[in-house]
Amino acid sequence: MVTIVLGAQFGDEGKGKITDLLSQSATLCCRAAGGHNAGHTIVHDDITYDFHILPSGLISPDCINLVGTGTVVHVPSFFKELDALKAKGLKDADKRIFISDRAQVCFDLHSVVDGLEEAILAGKKVGTTGKGIGPCYSDKASRRGVRIGEVLEKGVVESKLRALEAGYRRQFGELKYDLEDEVKRFHEYRTKLQPYVVDQMAFMHKHRSSPSVLVEGANALLLDIDHGTYPYVTSSCTGLGGAIQGLTLNPTSIKSIVGVVKAYSTRVGSGPFPTEQNNAVGEKLQRAGREFGVTTGRRRRCGWLDMVMCRYSNAINHYTVINLTKLDILDDFDEIKVAVAYQLDGKLLESFPAQADVLDKVEVKYVTLPGWKSNTMGATKWEHLPTNAQRYVEFIEREMGGVPIRWIGTGPARNHMIERI
């Protein structure tokens, strides 16, 4: 049976930790979409692991891992990340990771183009990670991209990459990019990549009877190309639909859809953020939560939990259970606000607006809850939480239409987790 872990907000919710927990009993862990723009941090045995394109299931020694068809793979980053994991003690990691031959190749060229496209946007920048994800997906949609399987074929990458570079040069003029160097490196990758590349259809068929398949979502619903705060989104489908499509999953095999919700809100980069706190509250959340992007190192924008957004996310992803993360970051607040509705021009909005400029204008309606002013870090049992912390969790459950909060994160370590059964 399949369990899917999805971000319910703007990303950085802490998906890696619940994935790590669930992967201990999983036989297969998969990434369905996105690329090395994603960032997951896991602390295990006092060692911090940073994941970008690789699935977090690599930490568990019995878990096989797949980078699926819906992803874009920057090959140098794939090997760099794999080497970093092995250097930290995951010696057999390279024996348990595979890539779909239908995944797209993200070139250094795409990163150069990403920067040029952002520069053209000037004051209306999307705020991308600069990793080339958008241009890579654009080339995929335009049917001129390169698939991972084609890297193994002699001469294919070189001819396609030269054509891509020529096209971008016609568009942007001279590029600060070494075409010959990238061509040379992919000659080497042709052999080096071969042990990792699989036919995903055959691979998934082989694992069709696997008792436990875990899908690790990247980014989050509000960054989805269709359902997110467009155009301030990533270039892939980050929700339930993207997971099914990117891994050719049988929908009837899905047992659990885990929505990961941070106990407050954060966002990296540009785009609307109705509950953002550009004040002492935001600074306190940023400082206490150490809110810096794993991929970019950028300071995350911080604000109160937004239940309008979370309900919208739930309506699209159909969560069966919630993992609430970083509850301990709210320990020192006298009172905690939660957004429960939006108004525009004095009228209550019935749904989450599609237009980014409308989201910038909404008036947020909050409910104020009392804080608990006591330490919850490291708590592992529900009864160990202060009464007001329990009430905060129960309030969120009600606002989510009764979707149960099964796991509550209370710190960075693997065992800093409450499981409510």
Curated annotation (Swiss-Prot):
One of its GO terms (biological process) is IMP metabolic process. Pathway: Purine metabolism; AMP biosynthesis via de novo pathway; AMP from IMP: step 1/2. Binds 1 Mg(2+) ion per subunit. The active site is at D12 (proton acceptor), H40 (proton donor). PROSITE patterns: ADENYLOSUCCIN_SYN_1, ADENYLOSUCCIN_SYN_2. It catalyses: IMP + L-aspartate + GTP = N(6)-(1,2-dicarboxyethyl)-AMP + GDP + phosphate + 2 H(+). One of its GO terms (cellular component) is cytoplasm. One of its GO terms (molecular function) is magnesium ion binding. Its cofactor is Mg(2+). CDD domains: AdSS. Coiled coil: none annotated. It holds the Pfam family Adenylsucc_synt. Its main location: cytoplasm. Its EC number is 6.3.4.4. This is Adenylosuccinate synthetase. It comes from Paracoccidioides brasiliensis (strain Pb18).
